[in-house]
Amino acid sequence: MENFPTEYFLNTSVRLLEYIRYRDSNYTREERIENLHYAYNKAAHHFAQPRQQKMLKVDPKRLQASLQTIVGMVVYSWAKVSKECMADLSIHYTYTLVLDDSSDDPHPAMVNYFDDLQAGREQAHPWWALVNEHFPNVLRHFGPFCSLNLIRSTMDFFEGCWIEQYNFGGFPGSDDYPQFLRRMNGLGHCVGASLWPKDLFDERKNFLEITTAVAQMENWMVWVNDLMSFYKEFDDERDQISLVKNFVTCHEITLDEALEKLTQETLHSSKQMVAVFADKDPQVMDTIECFMHGYVTWHLCDARYRLHEIYEKVKDQDTEDAKKFCKFFEQAANVGAVAASEWAYPPVAQLANVRAKSDVKEAQKPFLSSIELVE
């Protein structure tokens, strides 16, 4: 990857981590593994069900990788919610990642979307049918305002993925398009609203803080993800419709200029996030800070983002940014580098296979009439 701007990436990452005062102390190692396994186990059993297996039609290895990635994201970032809430959110966000990786045209299955919704019929699109079935398990954790945000943001996400099917980065001069698409498919409001379960927060009492958090999180969360994803997406053909690449097309600027634009906006958002909530409800600030730090840890430690490659490349360099980045990376790894073998078991495919064999045995049992049962 000769053209990747490594030095610039190091400087940007270091500034971000310094701005949020990164210091992930969300869990002990034992607590982290316990929560990871609990959320994974419930989610794995969910996706091993015959209905999910039949309707999703996802390659088993891809589903396994998606589930492990999402469980890590939720457990590391939603550190204050219950284990049950973590598990239900893990299922929901795994559905979104599965859709994000899909290449199916949604148009045919969406022709009667509203008519089916209004009539209470099952959606023709299999993803919507499954997500709607699971939604009550998610929404039971939240009040009506937060729930509305989760529903609406999920609908926006579906639309954003639909747009991405066209592999369209925007027309030159359409300056609003990149942020429009990123807000649409970023799940920012869903994430921002799902930090406030009703067993921990009264959404009426904390309405102003929650509303502001949803507004601020929309940009912060997706922009940090875009920065941390920049390395893995740089030469990946599947990831060419990214915010940075769309900036290049629509604003008619260079890649370096686009990255600088994203960097400045992310750093400004990080400053705002810390400053706005510094003097607000301490529980609210603690929740936001734990999310921010856990979210960064997840990016640094999850193999999906390949940031260990950057670490290996620069760990012997003597520049200030390289040394700072490596220190932050090692700090994250000390708390967040947990092998999947310690918590992501059994595999979904194994669970699905066991269920399938069980269903076959059940179907092969001899039928006994009521008279035979009495005899």
Swiss-Prot record:
Residues annotated as transmembrane: none
InterPro entries assigned to the protein according to its UniProt record, in alphabetical order: Isoprenoid_synthase_dom_sf, TRI5_ascomyc, Trichodiene_synth
Disulphide bridges: none
Recorded catalytic activity of this chain's protein: (2E,6E)-farnesyl diphosphate = trichodiene + diphosphate
Endpoints of the signal sequence: none
UniProt-recorded Gene Ontology molecular function terms: trichodiene synthase activity
Pathway note: Sesquiterpene biosynthesis; trichothecene biosynthesis
EC number(s) from the headed UniProt entry: 4.2.3.6
Pfam families for the chain: TRI5 (PF06330)
Alphabetized SUPFAM superfamilies for the sequence: Terpenoid synthases (SSF48576)
Record key words, sorted: Lyase
Comment field (misc): Trichothecenes are sesquiterpenoid toxins that act by inhibiting protein biosynthesis.
Function text: TS is a member of the terpene cyclase group of enzymes. It catalyzes the isomerization and cyclization of farnesyl pyro-phosphate to form trichodiene, the first cyclic intermediate in the biosynthetic pathway for trichothecenes. It serves to branch trichothecene biosynthesis from the isoprenoid pathway.
Name the UniProt record assigns to this protein: Trichodiene synthase
Biological source species: Fusarium cerealis
